[in-house]
Amino acid sequence: GAFGAVMEQLRKVDAPRLIERRLAGGRPVLGICVGMQVMFERSDEHGTAEEGLGQWPGTVSRLRADVVPHMGWSLVRPPSGSVLFDGVADERFYFVHSYAATQDPAELLGPGPTRLPQVTWATHGHDFIAAVENGSLSATQFHPEKSGDAGAQLLRNWLTTL
């Protein structure tokens, strides 16, 4: 999906407010693919600055790779202590995307009282964010539902947070 079109549809059904209320109540939210991208502050998809939900600082930009879109299986590099990747830290997951966030939101936030996001990385032309875990908000750039046994385990891991 396109970032701007997704944000437009989310706004039509007041989803930004609903997501914010859910997170404020500590209830888990999982974003997948463009669902992860819209959690960032903005996207420059198609050369137009689009505002996202702003849950994390940073911009979603076009991948800098010889082959775009990135379609296929890639190894991910989760941080130690990851809940989502428990038992699947050395697995490949299925990606299909042309845009991604590349700046660690924890670095953009800097030190302070907020709980810093844990970032999982992957590489396609350059490093990009493959997943983020941040309290009750989790998101993946890849499709766990298309990622076989590893994706099923990741979803089971997320379900333990409910």
Show the residue positions of the predicted features:
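Cysteine-nucleophile active-site neighborhood
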Residues: 1-72
